[in-house]
Regions:
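ABC ATPase NBD coupling module
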Residues: 32-36, 91-107, 133, 139-140
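Conserved ABC transporter NBD signature motif
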Residues: 82-90
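Conserved ABC ATPase "signature" region
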Residues: 90, 141-158
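Conserved ABC ATPase signature
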Residues: 163-167, 171
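Conserved signature/switch motifs of ABC ATPase nucleotide-binding domains
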Residues: 165, 183, 207
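Hydrophobic anchor residue at the start of the ABC signature
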Residues: 177, 205
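A short, proline-enriched helix->beta-strand linker immediately N-terminal to the Walker B motif
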Residues: 182-186, 202
Length: 241
């Protein structure tokens, strides 16, 4: 369940509405003739709204389903039941081709800046991959876009030729942010984006996210367990328990 802290954030229209969202993971026994003997209730009947241009903080204890909720919104996993309405479209009901097109509108910044980047790819290829997948830019245009994104997140264009292991944790998270921005999304799920970073670096990344939100008119769902961080960045807070 969630409890939303009410706070005035203006009269912005709703971009995302989650209604009665449920995700149960089945527990099975047996190998050849397996059968379901129970279920883990990862997300159990949650509802909330997110308005355009705001940051909704999503907090709760470990294991309460925060990260699962983020992945359900992006349809990285399928819900058991419930509605996820993004800009008037019910995500669980969309066919695959429409969902693929909609993915440009919604991106995610992962918690682990070390594990979320392919160590065999250069930074330029990592950031440019979404542009290739969604056929947004190729060749010289793609390289130009990658350079622009690197500079936007506080890195340099020459970093495009380097590999992830050559960067610090904070720099890697900036690369992850640049990758999320590549397709010009409207909604970004920030899945504990600073929890793996040193305290001295956390503030820099938070400030960067706030600056990018203003520059690109972004909407965030900021998932975290640190209430101080959530209070600093969020317009409203939803508590999962």
């Amino acid at each position: 369940m969630t409890r939303q802290q009410t706070a005035p954030v203006g009269q912005n229209e709703v971009l995302l509405e989650v209604r009665n969202l449920v995700k149960h993971f089945p527990i099975r026994q047996g190998i050849i003739f397996s059968k379901q003997v129970g279920a883990v209730q990862a997300v159990d009947d949650i509802s909330f709204t997110v308005r355009k241009g705001e940051t909704l903080g999503l907090v709760g204890e470990s294991g309460c389903g925060k990260t699962t909720t983020g992945r359900l919104i992006l349809r990285l996993i399928e819900p058991t039941s419930g509605d996820i309405i993004f800009d008037g479209k019910n995500i669980p009901q969309l066919p695959k081709d429409e969902m693929r097109e909609l993915r440009k509108e919604m991106q995610i910044i992962f918690q682990d800046p070390y594990g979320s980047l392919n160590p065999r790819m250069t930074v330029g290829d990592i950031i440019g991959e979404p542009l290739h997948i969604h056929k947004l830019a190729r060749g010289a245009e793609r390289e130009k876009r990658v350079r622009e994104l690197l500079e936007v997140v506080g890195l340099s264009a020459f970093h495009a030729r380097r590999f992830p292991h050559e960067f610090s944790g904070g720099q890697r998270q900036r690369i992850g942010i640049a990758r999320a921005l590549a397709v010009r999304p409207r909604l970004i799920i920030c899945d504990e984006p600073v929890s793996a970073l040193d305290v001295s670096i956390q503030a820099q990344v938070i400030n960067l996210l706030q600056d990018l939100q203003k520059e690109f008119d972004l909407t965030y769902i900021f998932i975290a367990h640190d209430l101080a961080v959530v209070k600093h960045i969020s317009d409203r807070v939803a508590v999962m328990y």
